[in-house]
Curated annotation (Swiss-Prot):
Record GO terms (molecular function): 4 iron, 4 sulfur cluster binding; iron ion binding; NADH dehydrogenase (ubiquinone) activity; NADH:ubiquinone reductase (non-electrogenic) activity; quinone binding
Cofactor note: Binds 1 [4Fe-4S] cluster.
PROSITE patterns membership: COMPLEX1_20K (PS01150)
Record InterPro entries: NADH_UbQ_OxRdtase-like_20kDa (IPR006137), NADH_UQ_OxRdtase_20Kd_su (IPR006138)
The name this protein goes by in its record: NADH-quinone oxidoreductase subunit B
PANTHER family hit by this protein: NADH DEHYDROGENASE, NADH DEHYDROGENASE [UBIQUINONE] IRON-SULFUR PROTEIN 7, MITOCHONDRIAL
Cofactor: [4Fe-4S] cluster
Alphabetical list of Pfam families matching this protein: Oxidored_q6 (PF01058)
EC number: 7.1.1.-
Reaction catalysis annotation: a quinone + NADH + 5 H(+)(in) = a quinol + NAD(+) + 4 H(+)(out)
Gene assigned in the entry: nuoB
UniProt KW keywords: 4Fe-4S, Cell inner membrane, Cell membrane, Iron, Iron-sulfur, Membrane, Metal-binding, NAD, Quinone, Translocase, Transport, Ubiquinone
Protein function: NDH-1 shuttles electrons from NADH, via FMN and iron-sulfur (Fe-S) centers, to quinones in the respiratory chain. The immediate electron acceptor for the enzyme in this species is believed to be ubiquinone. Couples the redox reaction to proton translocation (for every two electrons transferred, four hydrogen ions are translocated across the cytoplasmic membrane), and thus conserves the redox energy in a proton gradient.
Enzyme class: translocase
Amino acid sequence: MGLSDLSKAPGQALGDMLQLGNIESVIQWGRGNSLWPFPFATACCGIEYMSTACSDYDIARFGAERPSFSPRQADMILVLGTITYKMAPVLRQIYDQMAEPKFVISVGACASSGGMFNTYGVLQGVDRILPVDIYVPGCPPRPEAILDALVKLQTKLKTQGLEARRQEVMQKIQELNERNKPLVVR
């Protein structure tokens, strides 16, 4: 058996045994299939997230089985519940500590728009301080809706390049800075 025979495996050509691609497609595949969520739960949406993580819905099937309670080890933050003005700087600091690329899912009516709490102490939407990627409607949203948001984020990650993602986030942050004055704790 010579070197020329190595290119032919029994019943297969060498081209059938190789998977060709570039490094960015491998990174997109990895990012899309292994998200490390940081649940920032402040209200009833946090209880629904717990249901999502349990065996009935099993968030592990979607590659997000390892919740991280350290922002430096997370790449996705789920904002679950009402955010007050006193809590907003803490949430922003947690977001800033996360490694790039980072993703934000706003879960429930309270996180997305302040919900039924239209008061002076409640932030009327987390998108005033963070660049939100996906909104999950509901009060509280069902676990299926949270899983749907996770699948949509994974699809977005698998189809969008890293440079396009970086430009999108920088544009969102610039819009946030132009639209909002510095956040003042009341």
